[in-house]
Curated annotation (Swiss-Prot):
Fungal xylanase inhibitor. Possesses competitive inhibiting activity against several fungal endo-1,4-beta-D-xylanases belonging to glycoside hydrolase family 10 (GH10) and family 11 (GH11). May function in plant defense against secreted fungal pathogen xylanases. Is similar to class III chitinases, but does not exhibit chitinase activity. It comes from Oryza sativa subsp. japonica. It is found in: Secreted. Keywords: Disulfide bond, Plant defense, Secreted, Signal. This is Xylanase inhibitor protein XIP. InterPro entries: Cts1-like, Glyco_hydro18_cat, Glycoside_hydrolase_SF, Glycosyl_Hydrlase18_Chitinase. Induction: Induced by exogenous treatment with ascorbate, dehydroascorbate, citrate, sodium chloride and methyl jasmonate in roots. Induced by wounding in roots. CDD domains: GH18_hevamine_XipI_class_III.
Length: 293
């Protein structure tokens, strides 16, 4: 058992190292390009997203139900065949892509009402999607491990997500010279995001994706100031700007590629600027948005 676990850890370390190398090779202006996948069956497979050649990270979305009923979890990937995702994860990782799983989302049924609920969710994530193995535990993606967890908490209370972040991050002590479990967050652009501020205060998040959409507190004229506030508040995290790939997602928040490229010339001067997160693969496939960054 110990040898198998060591082999699994070494394998994941190699994959993640390749992903980090891919990140370093991205455009100096754009940085990392992260795409949300799993919101529309017509977006194509995860493998197709990785073969598009425009993304360094794909976030599978969402684990949309947890916490309300102990032991009850729901993975919602909009009708995609779950059994096909595992092989696609391994294929994407072999191409140097990072694959994250987002928890939460819009319209799900989730919360962490207690410390025990945080422990239970940690165990579910570790044994069902990450590097843990336990007899009798169903793994939706088979023997494929995602590279980390994104906290996409869009409803409910703030309590206990800080505890979950600490438990997930603590696994990194088992990995040498690399990050074994990435811990990231997708926040609203208005500072602070009260649902995630306690979790972010741990200082353990590798990345923060700041959504410049679905939040009336961030009109177009304030985007630069909002991003810089987040970047300066969390200097230990790589901070990415979150945008939509089409006005059909959020007409008021949509920035054409030329407008985003202009903004990037200023915000990429932040020392912890990380790149761009785009909602989502379906709309990016239709519009070719990221091809112009």
């Amino acid at each position: 058992m110990a040898l198998r676990r060591l082999a699994a850890l070494l394998s994941l370390a190699v994959l993640l190292s390749a992903g980090l190398a891919a990140v370093s090779a991205t455009s100096q202006n754009t940085g990392d390009t992260v795409i949300i996948w799993g919101r529309n069956k017509d977006e194509g497979s995860l493998r197709e997203a990785c073969d598009a050649g425009r993304y360094t990270t794909v976030i599978i979305s969402f684990l949309s139900a947890f916490g309300y009923i102990p032991g009850t979890y729901k993975l919602d990937i909009s009708g995609h065949q779950v059994s096909a995702v595992g092989p696609d994860i391994k294929y994407c990782q072999s191409k140097g892509k990072l694959i994250l799983l987002a928890i939460g989302g819009q319209g799900g049924e989730y919360s962490l009402p207690s410390s025990q609920a945080a422990v239970d969710l940690h165990d579910h994530l570790w044994y069902s999607y990450l590097g843990g193995r336990r007899n009798g535990v169903y793994r939706p993606f088979g023997d494929a491990n995602v590279n980390g967890i994104d906290f996409f908490i869009d409803q409910g209370a703030r309590e206990h997500y800080n505890e979950l972040a600490k438990m997930l991050y603590d696994h990194n002590k088992d990995y040498r010279a690399t990050v074994g479990v990435m811990v990231t967050a997708t926040t609203r652009c208005g500072y602070p995001d009260h649902r995630l501020d306690e979790a972010l205060a741990t200082g353990l998040f590798h990345r923060i994706h700041v959504k410049m959409f679905s939040d009336g507190r961030c009109p177009a004229w304030s985007r630069r100031q909002s991003f810089e506030k987040w970047a300066k508040t969390y200097p230990q995290s790589r901070v990415l700007i979150g945008v939509v790939a089409s006005p059909d997602v959020d007409k008021d928040a949509y920035m054409p590629p030329e407008a985003l490229n202009n903004l990037l010339q200023f915000i990429n001067k932040q020392p912890n600027f990380g790149g761009v997160m785009v909602w989502d693969r379906f709309y990016d496939k239709k519009t070719g948005f990221t091809a112009h960054l």
